[in-house]
Amino acid sequence: MRNQSKQEELVKAFKALLKEEKFSSQGEIVLALQEAGFENINQSKVSRMLTKFGAVRTRNAKMEMVYCLQAELGVPTASSPLKNLVLDVDHNDALVVIHTSPGAAQLIARMLDSLGKSEGILGTIAGDDTVFTTPAPGFSVKRLYHFILVHFNQEL
């Protein structure tokens, strides 16, 4: 089981690195993972992971060719659990930001709005794939963040 959790940690670190959109070669990814404590990582393993997770090379904001994970483009179905539409949850000092599958933000926002102030939600603003949520009076951003993580079964 220890190996399984080490593998999960590797996958989490790998995905986090690709979200940074600054690695232009597999060698750079290998070095970053080694610096993060994954000593046994090599280029062939990184290559397999890039393929497994559907990573592509694209231009970042600085117009550099970098590896990144493709946005989840799966179309939700009527039987898709809402938690599957939530890709990431983060927060700052003012609000909680929820990243969803494309087109799902308004559905997630409407569901959160229906929970109301008693659950800590003052209101939401939704775009296509992003929801901004602000806490109700008496609720901290951190408390709302944890509530949303639990509600959508996201990792703490």
Curated annotation (Swiss-Prot):
Pathway assigned in UniProt: Amino-acid biosynthesis; L-arginine biosynthesis [regulation]
UniProt entry keywords in alphabetical sequence: Amino-acid biosynthesis, Arginine biosynthesis, Cytoplasm, DNA-binding, Repressor, Transcription, Transcription regulation
Example GO molecular function: arginine binding
Compartments reported by the entry: Cytoplasm
Annotated signal sequence range: none
Source domain of life: Bacteria
Listed GO biological process terms: L-arginine biosynthetic process; protein complex oligomerization; regulation of arginine biosynthetic process
Keyword Zinc-finger (UniProt): no
InterPro entries in the record: Arg_repress, Arg_repress_C, Arg_repress_C_sf, Arg_repress_DNA-bd, WH-like_DNA-bd_sf, WH_DNA-bd_sf
GO cellular component terms listed in the entry, alphabetical order: cytoplasm
Residue stretches in coiled coil: none
Pfam families attached to this UniProt entry: Arg_repressor, Arg_repressor_C
HAMAP family named among the record's database cross-references: Arg_repressor
Record function comment: Regulates arginine biosynthesis genes.
Family label: Belongs to the ArgR family.
Official protein name in the record: Arginine repressor
Designated gene of the protein: argR
